[in-house]
Every structure is written in structure tokens, then in C-alpha cells.
Regions:
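N-terminal leader/auxiliary helical segments
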Residues: 1-197
Length: 197
């Protein structure tokens, strides 16, 4: 899952949102440096990632990107899932997505003193380029694919990922539809468990 999905699977809890979004930027024991609510978000993110990687729909979606991108295929699928979530009118109208994106940026701003250095350096671009909302558009996904390729070793072209998304759009959307209800149920249960710990 990518930024939008992790924010969505934080169930409106401010510290969970922050922890869920910064988790990939927090290594090892550094998670113990954060308040309990943010730590729970970090742990929830990692549990969601494990669930995502093992889900049959994700394995099916990754197969579409495997030949061109091998180990990075899961990262492309994470972005694709955010696209389908942003465009899922059963979850977000355009206005609801706008409000959700703005609310998420506001929570990150409010908790700015807890953002790890690398996330804090990236966050102004996320907000100014409106990543969370623009996942709704194919051009927004193309920007994300290009960013992924820029940051990755051994990759220099994202055009094949766009070709896969456009040519396999229906199959990939079916993977999303088979996956999202399951991950939402899993994340809700896990979030409740973490709240009780």
C-alpha cells in the first residue's frame, strides 16, 4: 500500500495517520522514540504491508509488472492500489477525497516535530504537488511511477509501468476490488488490537 491507502487505513485517528505514513522512514528501534499513538501507526503500517504482500490479489497484480520490474513490482502495485482507491466512488467522491487529502496534510503539519528528517524533506513536495488527491488521475500516477524510478537502483524508465496500467487496467482494478475489503477488515481488527495493548 502507498500513502493514500495507509492514511485511509488509519481510521481518522491523528497519531495513527502520522505513524502509518512515516513508518517506512523509521528504522529498527527508532520507533521507540515516538509517542505511543504514533508507534501504533508505525506497527499498523508494517502489519498492513505484510498482509498486502501475502494476499493472492496482490500476487496476481504483481505478476503484470514482474517481467519489466522484478523486485520492484510490488512498489508499482502499491501505487496502482492508491490510484484505484482514489478513484473508488464507493469510498471517495471527488469532494470527499479533496477533504481527506487536506485533512491528512493538516495532521502531518500539526505533528511536524515528529516527522523523520527524510519524510520531512519530502513532505513539502507531497503537499504542494497534492499527491494524495492526484493519485485519482493517470497523470498523477505517472508522476509517482517516475518518482519511484528516480529513487530506485537499477531502473531508468517507468513507461512500461504506464503501459501495463493502461493495457491491464481492468485486471488490475479487479485485483484492487478483491483486495481492498480484506485489507480494510484486517487493518480495522489490527488497529483495535493495538489500541488495547
Amino acid at each position: 500500500m502507498n500513502f493514500l491507502a495507509h492514511a485511509y487505513l488509519s481510521f481518522g485517528d491523528p497519531e495513527t495517520i502520522v505513524g502509518n505514513l512515516i513508518s517506512d522512514f523509521v528504522k529498527g528501534r527508532a520507533q521507540n522514540d515516538f509517542p505511543q499513538g504514533i508507534r501504533k501507526g508505525i506497527r499498523l503500517h508494517r502489519d498492513i504491508d505484510r498482509f498486502t504482500d501475502l494476499h493472492p490479489a496482490t500476487r496476481e497484480a504483481k505478476a503484470h509488472f514482474q517481467q519489466a520490474y522484478r523486485l520492484y513490482s510490488s512498489a508499482f502495485v502499491d501505487i496502482v492500489y492508491d490510484h484505484f482507491l482514489a478513484a473508488d466512488t464507493d469510498i471517495f467522491t471527488e469532494d470527499a477525497l479533496r477533504a481527506f487529502a487536506d485533512g491528512t496534510y493538516a495532521e502531518l503539519d500539526r505533528h511536524g516535530h515528529w516527522l523523520p528528517q527524510r519524510f520531512a524533506a519530502m513532505f513539502p513536495y507531497m503537499k504542494s504537488q497534492d499527491w494524495l488527491f492526484n493519485y485519482r488521475h493517470l497523470w498523477g500516477i505517472e508522476m509517482s511511477f517516475k518518482g519511484l524510478v528516480r529513487r530506485a537502483a537499477y531502473m531508468d524508465d517507468s513507461s512500461e509501468a504506464m503501459r501495463v496500467l493502461e493495457s491491464r487496467h481492468g485486471e488490475l482494478q479487479d485485483c484492487y476490488r478483491g483486495f481492498m475489503p480484506d485489507v480494510k477488515n484486517f487493518a480495522r481488527r489490527r488497529w483495535e488490537e493495538l489500541k488495547d495493548e
